[in-house]
Amino acid sequence: MPLASGDVLNLQRFSGAEPGPPVLMLHGAIENGRIFYSGSGRGLAIYLARNGFDVYVADLRGRGKSSPPIDRSSRFGQTEAITEDIPACVEAVINLRGPILQQWVAHSWGGVLFSSFLARFPEYIKLVGSLVYFGSKRTIRVWNIKRILQVDLAWRWVCPIACLIAGYLPARQLRIGSDSETVKSYRQSAAWVKNDAWVDSDDGFDYGAAIKKLSLPPTWYIAAQNDHVLGHPRDVRDFMESAGRQEQRYTVLSRKNGNRHDYDHITMLTHPDAVYDHFPQVLEWLRQHDRH
């Protein structure tokens, strides 16, 4: 999908012979849409498509199969993701399927971007049947050794230096993620993680204030027991409690709660057992909230 900037967004579609209800999926920071599918036919996107859904997996600008890839000349950030990339993806699904109900699934920071989009463009709320967020948090308040290493050391010290040297954040080369971020997107997301204020640095739009005035679609917040930093269960709950009025469901994937494993931030979507464990519950949730 071409953007006015000249960039091209990739929207990967997984569907059966007769497309079912549409599901739009959005990845988080320092990653791309491959968190939802693999070349070997695994992943939540493929699982849902095999069970009757018409699935669209987005790669935000410069990530995954979108082009051109992020480099030192890239000037966009999460403001553009919220105001340009996500609207383009939503409208693409509408153009293909008509103005029918969509359901949205996100991993990590993708949930923050989806909620920010709905806060800024509430006219789209009526289009969304439900939201499913895996490991989505906006702030990190938990304290442990992994937080010190991954956030206080790597995210707040190593990443700014890498941005200065490379002109962007080469997360894959640093082995802290699967895709790159621009300097702007890094700085904007880092500010939201650190501060209570949920405000756009470009124009001052107050997402936190706007979202409190809205009734969002039913939302399922899924955390993982072994996600110690990037989507700690307490931080996921904090995001849920700050994200407006909605029918809420909160789950921690753990052996204690009947799951096969104590999953982490990535394996909650990539573990081979997920298809037998919690993916069927996600499938049932989406079926229950499909109002066609």
Q: Where do the PLM segments sit?
A:
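N-terminal cap/lid segment of alpha/beta-hydrolase-fold proteins
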Residues: 1-16
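Short, surface-exposed "cap/lid" segments of acyl-processing enzymes
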Residues: 15-69
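Alpha/beta-hydrolase active-site loop
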Residues: 75-94
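Alpha/beta-hydrolase-fold enzymes
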Residues: 95, 99, 104-105, 109-202
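The feature captures the conserved acid-bearing segment of alpha/beta-hydrolase catalytic domains
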Residues: 206-215
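Short beta-strand/loop motif that positions the catalytic acidic residue
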Residues: 221-223
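Conserved alpha/beta-hydrolase "acid-adjacent" motif
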Residues: 228-235
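Catalytic active-site module of serine/aspartate enzymes centered on a nucleophile-bearing elbow/loop
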Residues: 248-292
